[in-house]
Amino acid sequence: MTDGVIRSNCDNGFQKNLVGRHKVKNTLAYGVNKRIHKRNIHKLRDSIARTLVQEEFKDEIPSDQGMLVPNKLWRVGRSSNTKVFVRTLDNDKGSYVVDILIDSSGSQRRNQALVASQAYVLAQALTLNGIPNRVMGFNSFLDYTILKRYRDYESSLRANENIFEYYCTGNNRDGLAIKAVVEELKSRPEDNKILIVLSDGRPNDIKVGKGQSQTLEEAYRGATAVRDTAIEVRRARQQGIMVLGVFTGKERDLPAEKLIYGKDFAYILSLIHI
């Protein structure tokens, strides 16, 4: 795991300049549609806030048992409605924490600015509601899966600007990245743990120049990679983590996205629907 070349001790000037250029590019692209993005942030922020407020209220419903309501005692023997008690329903689901995981592989390059904006909108809305959230990108380099952290759970609102450092290169071993994030997310104290994965439904991590071996490590593509990712998603859900997908790929890859996330994914067709 790394914080990236700009925010860590890195002597590679070329890499710093490269990431800096991508950050400028993503920021400019966001600025072109800034009004739409700000509207989306406010809509999502307000929607989350309403949900949190509703969970603070307790509902009271008529019941045959529970707390006695004295002014309903007249019904006994006089009415068919003999419910003179009320039962309290507690809507409080507890605290929330969210991890946002972004596929940073080369196949996302054509949508790089849009994906960065999507992640930024999500992080802004969550942070404005005081919900701890972490944003990370992942891709593969040689034999390693790299997790780049743009913001941590308790980072400030300003830290969300780091998301525009997002750039796409290399391959993507989605299953391993999800597994790594889940291991840390499990240890959080919040009651509700949510993982949102922005990906194109194309897990792919081919090892070049290693002969014809077809082990999982060297043939991570197609149905094998999709199945591995789907297994990790299901394992996470079995451990009590809600996993949601945000599809950022081409329509032809939708079947793979459905196999991985089931019904729990969103397909965003335009900026208006972010």
Regions flagged by a language model, labelled:
Residues D99-R109, N160-Y167, Q214:
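Glycine- and acidic
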Residues M1-S95:
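Acidic/polar low-complexity segments with low predicted structural confidence
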Residues V135-E161, R252-I260:
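Short beta-strand-loop
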Residues R75, D90-L198, P203, R235-R237, L244-T248:
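Von Willebrand factor
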Residues R202-L259:
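VWA/integrin I-like adhesion module and closely mimicked acidic/polar interface patches used
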Residues V115-S117, R149-E154, G209-A219, L259-D264:
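Short secondary-structure boundary/capping segments
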Residues I272-I274:
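Conserved small/polar residues in nucleotide/adenosyl-binding loops
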